[in-house]
Amino acid sequence: LMTHRNPSVIVMDFIPNVSASMLNERIERFMSIIEDKIPGVQILFIEHVPFPLAEFNLKKGEWVEESNEALRKAFRELKKKGYQNLHYLKSEHLLGEDGESTVDGEHFTDLGFDRFAKGIYPVVKKLIRHAER
């Protein structure tokens, strides 16, 4: 579906919905399809936001960190393989630290969506400008 459009930027915020093994299994094939169908498109990878209840749910906190590490590793490997238009955004400051950005430590509230959007906006804007050159 994405390859039927002509986007300037693709924002990849999928980490909350995949495991590290799923990421490793599928990312290179996905990237080759995007590169083939939409050459030159800017791609922004975004980490899973920190899990605010990690101190109480160690398993979930570890899963988030493992997923983010898998994304960082995949990003580095894709860059080494020659994918040029890749960008990476750490998520540690996107939601703030007051605990008001999620309903349950994971799913965003209206405030969480607002903070997330405001956090990624400058990066996406810069990538759109870069793509328009």
Task: List each language-model region with its residue ranges.
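Oxyanion-hole/transition-state-stabilizing segment in secreted/luminal serine hydrolases
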Residues: 1-42, 48-55
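Aromatic/hydrophobic pocket-lining residues that form the small-molecule binding cavity
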Residues: 23, 27, 71, 113
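Substrate-gating cap/lid alpha-helix
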Residues: 51-90, 115
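Short acidic/His/Gly/Ser-rich catalytic and metal-binding motifs that mark active-site loops
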Residues: 52-55, 95-99
